[in-house]
Swiss-Prot record:
Organism taxonomic ancestry: Bacteria, Pseudomonadati, Pseudomonadota, Gammaproteobacteria, Enterobacterales
Gene3D superfamilies found in the cross-reference section: 3.30.1130.10
Keyword Lipid biosynthesis among record annotations: no
Subcellular location: Cytoplasm
SUPFAM superfamilies: Tetrahydrobiopterin biosynthesis enzymes-like
Record family assignment: Belongs to the GTP cyclohydrolase I family. QueF type 2 subfamily.
Protein's UniProt keywords contain Oxidoreductase: yes
Principal subcellular localisation of the protein: cytoplasm
Record: active site: C189 (thioimide intermediate), D196 (proton donor)
Enzyme Commission no: 1.7.1.13
Function: Catalyzes the NADPH-dependent reduction of 7-cyano-7-deazaguanine (preQ0) to 7-aminomethyl-7-deazaguanine (preQ1).
Complex and partners: Homodimer.
Record-given protein name: NADPH-dependent 7-cyano-7-deazaguanine reductase
Length: 281
């Protein structure tokens, strides 16, 4: 998108550039992206956000050496609060985690402390982190968003350019409280334009939203270039702008890349996100 072109924060990223893998711990590999880059275009300010929320990351490829040199593995769960100044750029996150591979740590607690310290410093805000042994996940089933899937509609689409106007005039006077789900969300990385595949849950209370128009709107992200977190905030903003629901939650879970998946959520009401893996995760 042209509104990001020339921004120094993006030009400094390792994303889209040839990089070397570091096998010893290096916190400087982490890179943050100011959330304001997207929020300025939506007229959102840090001191008056219309939502709360977080960016939930799952770290599947985390390994280090114990004090005897024996490799250790874990799966990590990280959540950045939506109020952090920066989001974490995913390639830098991957490179940072790889730097643990040949580094010795005395115990798991020190690894957790190190990760939390570095991610908090990069995000410039509140971060929660927990490491789990692999056994923690062996009995966890694949789940699905609970809601009505809107994907199987007999409609024809031939335009895949982003257009928020699909939501204009999309409500009726019927008041509802419902949860809608689509697995057709696809956008592209802001820098590399690599595809990002996701499922999205939209939970709202207010005037009924036309499901065909909502699906056309979501499909219009198909050639849109933004980070995962930015797309979710844009969806939240556009639904609030055009549909004016009393309450709204938008929660997307994306497929993993480089051993990481990103699952942003934004809400203006009480909401606790389920963190179970979806079928494509």
């Amino acid at each position: 998108m042209s509104l990001y072109q020339g921004d120094k924060a993006l030009e400094a990223l390792s994303l889209g550039k040839e990089t070397q893998y570091h096998t010893h711990y290096d916190a400087s590999l982490l890179q943050g992206v100011p959330r304001r880059l997207n929020r300025d275009s939506l007229s959102l300010t840090a001191d008056n956000l219309p939502f709360h929320g977080g960016d939930i990351w799952t770290m599947y490829e985390l390994s280090w050496l114990n004090s005897q040199g024996l490799p250790q593995v874990a799966i990590g769960h990280v959540e950045l609060d939506a109020t952090t100044e920066n989001l974490i750029e995913s390639k830098s996150f991957k490179l940072y985690l790889n730097s643990f591979n040949q580094t010795r740590f005395e115990n798991w607690h020190i690894v957790e402390e190190t990760l939390l310290k570095d991610l908090t410093a990069c995000a410039k805000g509140r971060v929660h982190l927990t490491l789990y042994p692999l056994s923690h996940f062996t009995s966890q089933p694949i789940v699905d968003f609970v809601g009505e899937c809107i994907d199987n509609q007999p409609i024809e689409i031939d335009n895949y350019q982003f257009d928020s106007q699909w939501l204009n005039g999309s409500t009726t006077d019927t008041l509802v409280e419902e949860t809608l789900v689509s697995h057709l969300l696809k956008s592209n990385c802001l820098i590399t334009h690599q595809p990002d595949w996701g499922s999205v849950m939209i939970q709202y209370k207010g005037k009924k939203i036309d499901r065909e128009k909502l699906l056309r709107y979501l499909v219009s992200f198909r050639q849109h270039n933004e980070f995962h977190e930015q797309c979710v905030e844009r969806i939240f903003h556009d639904i609030m702008t055009f549909c004016s629901p009393d309450t709204l939650t938008v929660y997307a879970r994306y497929t993993r890349r480089g051993g990481l998946d990103i699952n942003p959520w934004r809400s203006n009401c009480e909401f606790v996100p389920e963190t179970g893996r979806l079928a494509r995760q």
